[in-house]
């Protein structure tokens, strides 16, 4: 049964499930109260123009007329992940890159001037009919839309997909972008990221999240921020996840028996 006067109101859980859920919530602090930020990946408005494979990247670099242009262009083209590339604890090297002709950050970083990147401009001009009419663009059709958290892609971060069968989080310390089928978490303190990384990948939290979230049939969940931000994570310290949430042997056995 479910007590409809509690936070379990809209989820039908068995008594043991309700007990586990309450214990998790009693010990953990919701992610929304941690010193973190969650952002969505880049929306290009035309992936076929701005997301390229390694062959096209080499072609663009080979078309640069000077060594200075080649260096600038190499720094502009960055690896990018999609939601399907995110696995638990790791990501797949998909060989894809983002042409990061960003729109700058007001008062901090100027937008990319395409005239400084002739080889990139020649590539994008092949898609002019599409990039010129897209809604998601910057000051010029060559620029990506505004992104105030642009510099956070340079920081250590946790990536996760917007649709996933399980909670799959991977840690990335490199400069890495992601597209709009992916979210990422950043924090000023890397210890926080490492702590969250361990808990968010645990199947106990996977089970808990599925009591909150929107499920797509029986095989996937949507990782909406309104639900992700409610995941209760305990303070940094204890390593035994079951112990820190005060689960008894029966509750541990129940979670271990679930096919998540």
Regions found by a protein language model. Give the residues of each.
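Extended amphipathic alpha-helical segments enriched in small hydrophobics
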Residues: 227-259
